[in-house]
Amino acid sequence: MNTNARFGWMLIGTCIAISAHGGEVPVKLASGEQAALVQSRCSVCHSLDYIVMNSRFLSRTAWEGEVRKMMKVMGAPVSENEVAPIVDYLTQNYGVK
């Protein structure tokens, strides 16, 4: 494949990727004392949509399990001292009602 054709395909791929991402609506977390902490820790690895999408399914115990899984399995940058405040925020704002 010549250089011009390769460049053309790269340009097309870039345009598709940009347009696919452009349609996303940013998620604004519920206000709360720990909202900034949750946003800064969770958004390192995934969209904040994950929190909203799972909110109707997760109890306090389940949220804690999710946070610990993200730490241990996925390597999330959450310290042990941050687990309780994050779980408190998630349970209060996004836990099973």
Language-model features, listed with the residues they occupy:
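Extracytoplasmic/secreted proteins, especially bacterial periplasmic and envelope-associated proteins
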Residues: 33, 37, 62-65, 69, ...
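C-terminal capping alpha-helices of c-type cytochrome domains
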Residues: 77-97
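Bacterial N-terminal signal peptides that target proteins for export
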Residues: 1-10
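The canonical Cys-X-X-Cys-His
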Residues: 39-49, 86, 90
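N-terminal, post-signal-peptide region of Sec/Tat-exported proteins
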Residues: 48-78
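Bacterial N-terminal signal peptides
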Residues: 9-19
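Alpha-helix N-cap/helix-initiation sites
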Residues: 35, 56, 79-83
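Electrostatic cytochrome c docking/interface patches
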Residues: 18-37, 72-75
